[in-house]
């Protein structure tokens, strides 16, 4: 299981803080594509609080997490992701929403090859 957290720039006012739920809606939200696991988790949590992604000031869908993380590092918005993903980018910081304790299973999907397994093991070591 892995924590699902808010992700922002290390220079963002939310960085390493616990914020009130309504504070997130003034932000530019970066989302993964429809059908992605992280987007589904966020939409489910928002629904549980009678909200949608439409409540954010601005929403942009980006299918590439590296590009998204670069925009977030430049303090252009926020996203929500597994904490292990946030930790793999030194320019990003977590933030927490008061009353949201989101923990989900984190599953790896990879090609069955020696190279893939080696990369997976290296990535898995980041979370330890």
Stretches with model-predicted labels:
Residues 53-64:
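Short beta-strand-to-loop elements that line the ligand-binding cleft
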Residues 44, 65-94, 99:
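A ligand-binding cleft/hinge motif common to bilobed small-molecule-binding domains
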